[in-house]
Regions:
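Detector for methionine-enriched segments
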Residues: 67, 73, 92, 103, ...
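Juxtamembrane boundary at the C-terminal end of a transmembrane helix
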Residues: 147-153
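Alpha-helical transmembrane segments of multi-pass membrane proteins
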Residues: 73-85
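Post-HEXXH active-site segment of zinc metalloproteases
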Residues: 33-63
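Polar-ligand-bearing catalytic/cofactor-coordination segments
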Residues: 1-43, 82-131
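Select subsegments of transmembrane alpha-helices in polytopic membrane proteins
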Residues: 39-49, 130-144
Length: 153
């Protein structure tokens, strides 16, 4: 989901049992609080720019207070992580219910088939939510570590 244009772009998942849940997930992003989505978009870009500019300034030895730059990076990383994880967790948790409701209303599968798919969604979400949170945490930690190393040079 692209917040600025209010458009959903989905990979080719036609032959996947996760198709309905994936569509539901992206649709849920489109109805999340617009202010949070726009904040996430703007803040994510500021976060990336801060990281790149800090690296460049550190490499050309233009940073006087290295601890201040690193502390700001840690602070920005926390904000980035909490906003992104909130948006992703919210969409991942709710997508299962939206997908299940759609399959029941559309009557495209039997109750047993729907139950099997929903059970698969539960397994997928159990792993997926943890994985997304881990990935976001690692992404912020790695950026912070890279900046710390460059600041030491």
């Amino acid at each position: 989901y692209i917040a600025l244009t209010n458009k959903i772009i989905i990979a080719d998942v036609k032959n996947s049992y996760t198709r309905i849940q994936t569509i539901a997930h992206e649709c849920l992003h489109s109805v999340q609080d617009r202010k949070i989505l726009l904040f996430n978009f703007i803040f994510s870009n500021i976060y990336i720019i801060y990281f790149i500019v800090s690296i460049i300034l550190a490499l050309i030895n233009k940073i006087q207070d290295k601890m201040l730059f690193l502390t700001i990076m840690i602070f920005l990383s926390y904000i980035y992580y909490f906003v992104r994880s909130y948006l992703e967790n919210d969409a991942m948790i709710k997508a299962k219910y939206v997908a299940e409701e759609y399959m029941k209303e559309a009557k495209i599968l039997s109750e047993e088939e729907i139950e099997n798919i929903v059970n698969s969604y539960n397994k997928l979400n159990n792993i997926g939510i943890k994985t997304v949170n881990f990935q976001l945490m690692m992404e912020t930690a790695i950026k912070t570590i890279i900046l710390a190393i460059v600041l030491l040079i």
